[in-house]
Swiss-Prot record:
Keywords from the named record: ATP synthesis, Cell inner membrane, Cell membrane, CF(0), Hydrogen ion transport, Ion transport, Lipid-binding, Membrane, Transmembrane, Transmembrane helix, Transport
CDD domains hit by this protein: ATP-synt_Fo_c_ATPE
Positions of the record's site feature: Reversibly protonated during proton transport: D60
Membrane topology classification: Multi-pass membrane protein
Principal place of residence: membrane
Keyword Transmembrane in record: yes
Protein name, entry field: ATP synthase subunit c
Organism: Pseudoalteromonas translucida (strain TAC 125)
Chain's role: F(1)F(0) ATP synthase produces ATP from ADP in the presence of a proton or sodium gradient. F-type ATPases consist of two structural domains, F(1) containing the extramembraneous catalytic core and F(0) containing the membrane proton channel, linked together by a central stalk and a peripheral stalk. During catalysis, ATP synthesis in the catalytic domain of F(1) is coupled via a rotary mechanism of the central stalk subunits to proton translocation.
SUPFAM superfamilies: F1F0 ATP synthase subunit C
InterPro entries: ATP_synth_csu_bac/chlpt, ATP_synth_F0_csu, ATP_synth_F0_csu_DDCD_BS, ATP_synth_F0_csu_sf, ATPase_proteolipid_c-like_dom, F/V-ATP_Csub_sf
Amino acid sequence: MELVLGLKYIAVALLIGFGAIGTAVGFGNMGGKFLEACARQPELAPSLQVKMFILAGLIDAVAMIGVGIAMVLLFVL
């Protein structure tokens, strides 16, 4: 039984950790592409900024869903 609990804790840690790493990589790629696009066509910067913030919310939601699933694994199952 202790082995199962230990593996559950490792699974929760990996789920939260990989979710955070994926979110960080996503934000980095998105920010870099946004800056490249604004440097090429500065007149499109306001519309690109709105789209970037919408995508930032969606990318961040992936990490929050991962944390929610991890909490269910930790406290319910």
